Amino acid sequence: MVVPACVLVFCVAVVAGATSEPPGPEQRVVRRAAEVPGPEPSQQEQVAFGSGDTVELSCHPPGGAPTGPTVWAKDGTGLVASHRILVGPQRLQVLNASHEDAGVYSCQHRLTRRVLCHFSVRVTDAPSSGDDEDGEDVAEDTGAPYWTRPERMDKKLLAVPAANTVRFRCPAAGNPTPSISWLKNGKEFRGEHRIGGIKLRHQQWSLVMESVVPSDRGNYTCVVENKFGSIRQTYTLDVLERSPHRPILQAGLPANQTAILGSDVEFHCKVYSDAQPHIQWLKHVEVNGSKVGPDGTPYVTVLKTAGANTTDKELEVLSLHNVTFEDAGEYTCLAGNSIGFSHHSAWLVVLPAEEELMETDEAGSVYAGVLSYGVVFFLFILVVAAVILCRLRSPPKKGLGSPTVHKVSRFPLKRQVSLESNSSMNSNTPLVRIARLSSGEGPVLANVSELELPADPKWELSRTRLTLGKPLGEGCFGQVVMAEAIGIDKDRTAKPVTVAVKMLKDDATDKDLSDLVSEMEMMKMIGKHKNIINLLGACTQGGPLYVLVEYAAKGNLREFLRARRPPGMDYSFDACRLPEEQLTCKDLVSCAYQVARGMEYLASQKCIHRDLAARNVLVTEDNVMKIADFGLARDVHNLDYYKKTTNGRLPVKWMAPEALFDRVYTHQSDVWSFGVLLWEIFTPGGPSPYPGIPVEELFKLLKEGHRMDKPASCTHDLYMIMRECWHAVPSQRPTFKQLVEDLDRILTVTSTDEYLDLSVPFEQYSPGGQDTPSSSSSGDDSVFTHDLLPPGPPSNGGPRT
């Protein structure tokens, strides 16, 4: 039978690690079978496994062609990842298989529900013996196990940063074929003992742990044995916790360079940073004959900066081709992260071609001798004059008295940097300001205006063009007020624009000022996007620091959704009035899509948010979602995760396990938070995530693999996206780019007139079914799910009403 090319896929049942001897009672076997072309949806691949085996099913097309987003189902019901069931885009693993795992498994396209491949899985009582030949006839060279590659096992101590992947190998042989098992600190080590599980590659004699965290530290021992004996090897793993600090630049780089006219030059800059760094190469230039501005800061041009497809390795090298005399000068490597900035500079000297040098050699040697004598004599005269001048000006000595008091007009200062990310490379305007900020010792600023900040021409706004209005709210180190600004709109400079102004409180410290300046500089560096709160300007001269950002008229997303719930809900914002507008499925999907777009942009700029939630998404008058507070400098090591926010919510409920337990923050931990935000969107105006669950119980449930149940107004497809965001292994979660694509497809097929049935009782969200949001519970099945998903939606992939 000829299978059409468009549906041809390869379906693989993987059976690995089989030996000629039955495995011991503690051994776990991964069974593998040869790759075969995938059947049509009506066909099934028959596969048998032994009880206790690790089952691995794979489904992928020939030549690596993408199949699109997929889901796995058992007996027609969607599978959900857990500590025992690992679900990937094209691979399914079931650890410690039992009779309950027998059935028909299928891999389906997530949106079209087209079946890509079928497996009929049978689980028997006897463990698998693999595909090896029957080992009853013992060969002449029978004996105890031995290491086959001992030279690869010399490195017994492994120290890696958190979030890396670690592999331990113990390649061995023997007759009969030995079995391998693993111990951690002398005790049996299994996948359920670790968040994210482990991968046992029996055919490769290896143990793999992805996204390691500090709790993975310890001694790992492989035990290889058969009936003639056993051998073992112990490795020590040390996971280095990431600490917040500004980037560290390798000393001596970039180095000064001397080049011949027309040659090529490379500057190198080695950057070390746990937090994702931004790297830029700058060249110092002259403007109107001066290399510095009126405030003493240098003029520079940005030569190289991060793009969507550039890597840090590429940014660490600046290449100049066919250099000219105009290329000579000072170059700076600038690296920054959410903690601070570092920079090193080097000089390029361009010499004329060799023939020109030969002509000037003779004359140059004569002039050099005369010049050297002249310089020495001139320096001698200067030293004598300086000594005489100092003696004439020194006051007569007095007896012991009160110590001299020196008036300090500025606080002791640290260096900070101001960048403009979207300026032209050929611009001669000052693009970077290396300014001085107050020290971090923390005295109260009696008058913030005494601290002088450098003016940035692109962002500076005169205070006379700003009219402050009513307060909008308070933050951890400042307050936000509404204001009218003239000159923000470049097309209509005389028209006032409503803005939000961030400023410090009266009792602010110099650390608070440093944080506000850092937030402003981070917003400059990240640039503009429709779905983030953008910087509009700043007032840094002649008074306290004002940071002008976009104004969102409808407040944060949580209150926006809450105000639009139908009346009569126990937790509605105001049960006595009708909602402002009724939301449709498409409205909510649009909210999620816009937030995903904003996070995709922030990720492309290598910005990790670390506090993504509905409370930190603002809504404009035109219902545009804008992510806020992405530029805050958060000290993740000193943060009190148990402290409630001003609205009484615990930030821990939005945090990924690796961030919660080990304080490892990556773009993938932001993806977890996005999944919780999705739950908020489709539980409009409802309680906080994990309602009624105490924090201590929440920690336990997350470690056991429990996740929140599907909201009543959420479709199967959207809930599958949530569950993918909540995958225990960070690398298995989707990227924000993938989330944008998935939500775009769902948004396209969603009708504009499908209204949500939001009139669900509050018991839907409270485990105990109490009448008030303050009820507490240890967690019931109504909030968490650990089992299979409900049956899928219709084949068109659109949301159900």
From Swiss-Prot:
Positions with a binding annotation for ATP: 472-480, 502
Span list, region Disordered: 125-146, 762-801
Cytoplasmic face of the membrane: 391-801
Tree of life domain: Eukaryota
Biased composition (Pro residues): 790-801
Keyword Membrane appears in the UniProt entry: yes
Protein name as annotated: Fibroblast growth factor receptor 3
Source species of the chain: Mus musculus
